[in-house]
């Protein structure tokens, strides 16, 4: 989406030129990709065409796939026009309008749920981005504090983690139930040994781009995620030129 939005013109009434505004921050996210494709323009065009064909979700009945968060309500509505999750250019264009259905779909499925940090606080991530929000779990059964729901590499300060969630905070959270199909997500930059988050939920993003692990799961006929079926390779940091 970051790449498609960078090249897709926004609607005339959206007060921006492109769906993904050409800010230094947005450019930084794509910088390495641009650099690696600089001498391969046709390959890059082919990749952009491929990105446009990729589904935003896969619902195979027994298991599901989504980048960041499964939202039954949004996905159900999306299926009405895009049953297989493959959206078109018009949908990307529509996402330039904040609060539009397309915008809410991309924000939720590709970015997940989040909460604003209390008391005007901000956090600076390992990548150098300063944020006023933090990523949250979308499966916690009965969370009471900020620490119960935080789900990101950068920990909350202890004095923030212990603060109670307000009713408004709780209303912004989702709950993916234990009775739902197995769900595999990425997005969250995990560390350590790959393992399920719950019997029906696993994250396969273990920070490969930051020299972590490139992770997969060997799926057979099981109905719950088997901790012994994660497979991975360690991503080696390249040696510096002599």
Enumerate the language-model features and the residues they cover.
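Generic low-complexity segments that are intrinsically disordered, proline-rich and/or Lys/Arg-biased
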Residues: 12, 119, 228, 239-242
